[in-house]
Amino acid sequence: PGSGASNAAGGGGAGAAGNNSSPPNTAGSGGNGRANNITGSCVTYAGGGGGGSDSNAPQTTPGGTGGGGAGGNGAVGTAGTANLGGGGGGGGRGPSCAQNAGGAGGSGVVIARAPGTSGVVFSSSPGCVADISLASDRGQIAKFTASGTLNISDAGAGIPMSYLIIAGGGGGGTGAGAAAEGAGGGGAGGYRVSFNCETSGGGSSSESELFVSAGAYTITVGGGGNGATNNCGANGSAGSPSSLSGITSIGGGYGGGDGQNGGPGGS
């Protein structure tokens, strides 16, 4: 996650670290996320939030690809995108603290995929926010945008299941008054994947598939951290973790407020 400075740093993404500010008045952009096609469509997740800058900056500072929120240009930071795990943008440097609040982090997502040869059947418990679909190889895909239960039937002696687990992004910090500093962008939510030999966030190696049998599996989808509000120089809040059957992705770190360091997190 980014730290607060006159023009602040961006939060880290799953694919790259956040960028530092550059003179004379440009804040650092958020680190880019990582692309993944576990659903059959290529989607980029877990971008870091942009750092906040003063109103003399040439433009707002972008968040990283994958849902990172833009940093405020003498204004409020933009929220990270829901269900992509993006970090919130840092608040800018401007006339009042209330006008320089940080953006909230985006919520995470959990996606599971079974091979087409398995004959497995996915379903979700009533009331769960889940999308069950067929892949091109006739495999089953379950996408959870909120916490719930994944029910697996007809799995025989057990099957290998691929997954993508994105945690909630961290919230951006609050900037301060006209004579002070902008705030850092929030870090992206943690990114863990076992699909198609792709690497996890932060350059980690590809993870093993999860071997599952018939039964009910608890899914937790982490919420994004709150952006800091009103209090000058306040830090944002860290994102919440996401998990699937004991495999946990850590929430994104908070963005540092005016003059503060950001917190550690999943990306």
Spans of features found by a protein language model:
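Low-complexity, glycine/proline-biased repetitive segments and flexible coils/loops
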Residues: 1-267
